[in-house]
Amino acid sequence: MSEKIYPVTKPVKARALIDKEKYLKWYEESVENPDKFWGKHGKRIDWFKPYTKVKNTSFTGKVSIKWFEDGQTNVSYNCIDRHLKTNGDQVAIIWEGDNPYIDKKVTYNELYEHVCRMANVLKKHGVKKGDRVTIYMPMIPEAAYAMLACARIGAVHSVVFGGFSPEALAGRIVDCESTFVITCDEGLRGGKPVPLKDNTDTAIHIAARQHVHVSKVLVVRRTGGKTGWAPGRDLWHHQEIATVKPECPPVKMKAEDPLFILYTSGSTGKPKGVLHTTGGYLVYAAMTHEYVFDYHDGDVYWCTADVGWVTGHSYIVYGPLANCATTLMFEGVPNFPDQGRFWEVIDKHKVNIFYTAPTAIRSLMGAGDDFVTRSSRSSLRLLGTVGEPINPEAWEWYYNVVGDKRCPVIDTWWQTETGGHMITPLPGAIDLKPGSATVPFFGIKPELVDNEGKVLEGAADGNLCITDSWPGQMRTVYGDHDRFIQTYFSTYKGKYFTGDGCRRDADGYYWITGRVDDVLNVSGHRLGTAEVESALVSHNLVSEAAVVGYPHPIKGQGIYCYVTLMAGHEGTDTLRQDLVKHVRAEIGPIAAPDKIQFAPGLPKTRSGKIMRRILRKIAEDDFGALGDTSTLADPAVVDDLIANRQNKATA
């Protein structure tokens, strides 16, 4: 583990919003007196009706989380209208297309008109407050307009990543009973079309079989590619917005009215609908965006995530726009036309703050320094990373080569469930250690506990819990509050359990060590092993499957599958390829297995439980100490798995 320390540099400290002294003072107040602290900082957004209650939360019993509950506000108003008087002509969104020669800029005045028109189209077709709208879009400005239009009229959006399959999309439509979908004829990624409208049509058929009927589909024209069309149901976005007014009053929303549902992987098969509400979420997204990235007026800020993930919600759309920032939306991929794309975009748009995932950093590091050094990158002031822990080697390369040793690397740990950054350095206050997410943000009380629930003090290695609520916290699992309590609050009573392992060093810095449950982190995206297993088992030749993660040089974690076939069938390379295709179709490319090992049997206890610990060790090519195997029903299975492992170290 790297123990190198990079102190805050003079230039960074000189312009920083928060220095060490202020961090310590604010942090102490935020945990000692959260009502006073958040009562003050809740005022960073505009309220139609000011709140008088700040925090009303309980992590025990029925678990209830409420912030600013008697206040009324509107997220779309805070992200657009309140900026118009003084900053209407400022650029809100810079859009950089998949094709490097195509881009556009959208000012706050233009954003207002686009969002109001889309909101009026939704209203015209019967969408009202509380209705769920599914958004299945590529990274184009209309995706942000759709989110903000829903927020404007009080509809609850559920954004589904454009890389997910029709089956995955259908499952999310069914779970929240969404009857209105916003999509696009086709997306573009790396020069290749993505059939979003065709996928949507397939998903709607699947949903209908489960008695959820989508009544309208609003289709944005992106490529002009051929798609199916259902008259009466399907609507062209460009035709619809021409028929409505360019203004739409924002609906007064209670702070605890739902804002969005975002599905995330759980350790059981069915994805969970993480529910975020209006007031607390926006306060937290905006505040973390400002202080973690040390955002100053006039900065150009670029987060490379997709709006289909929480990072896109909090740090492309809501946080930046609430702060009247200029946020860059990128439709493309890091290696198209070549591996220099990120650095060219930074030069082209004079980007000051750049936020990306360790997977992208590792892959670009592998492409060599020349792609980076042929660009100037002189506009860069701060680098951020998100999605998974960054290994010290990649951190050093990012700092030394991309940032020319002058930009702090802000390694942010947080989750879909947390709404915003939880453990992160503040650039002007915290010395950096490569590989460490460093220290908690204001109001966050981390605690390490062992497997028995004993609280660990000082330098320790354990399970990461948070002991008190913060405004950005998810409120429930949509439609299943018991699952919310069970998943997050039952393992360690009265504490929010993150599902991550963590080490705290002697300086009090936190190092995230990865998931401790059956959830994989592949390229910064969460995937439940159970989801991949059920996709494999749905293939007619597969009798049983077990999926584990293993260290992958680029993705962080790769997907290793043990597959037992139906009697009488042989495992072949053709079948292997077929299974990869099958999983891609069921879930999406993100879930494609890296290694498939055909196994006559899996290591099970006498009660029939699969011993995943053993499977993990074998997948990691580290089976010298498998631990206690005395409860195995058939120990010979293990020898066969070891002999046929797919991940043997090359001599």
UniProtKB/Swiss-Prot annotation:
Acetylated. Deacetylation by the SIR2-homolog deacetylase activates the enzyme. It comes from the Bacteria. It catalyses: acetate + ATP + CoA = acetyl-CoA + AMP + diphosphate. ATP binds at residues 387-389, 411-416, 500, 515, 526. InterPro entries: Ac_CoA_lig, ACAS_N, AMP-bd_C, AMP-bd_C_sf, AMP-binding_CS, AMP-dep_synth/lig_dom, ANL_N_sf. GO terms for molecular function: acetate-CoA ligase activity; AMP binding; ATP binding; metal ion binding. Its cofactor is Mg(2+). Its EC number is 6.2.1.1. Disulfide bonds: none annotated. The modification N6-acetyllysine is found at residue 609. GO terms for cellular component: cytosol. Catalyzes the conversion of acetate into acetyl-CoA (AcCoA), an essential intermediate at the junction of anabolic and catabolic pathways. AcsA undergoes a two-step reaction. In the first half reaction, AcsA combines acetate with ATP to form acetyl-adenylate (AcAMP) intermediate. In the second half reaction, it can then transfer the acetyl group from AcAMP to the sulfhydryl group of CoA, forming the product AcCoA. Belongs to the ATP-dependent AMP-binding enzyme family. NCBIfam families: Ac_CoA_lig_AcsA, PRK00174.1. PANTHER family: ACETYL-COENZYME A SYNTHETASE, ACETYL-COENZYME A SYNTHETASE 1. This is Acetyl-coenzyme A synthetase.
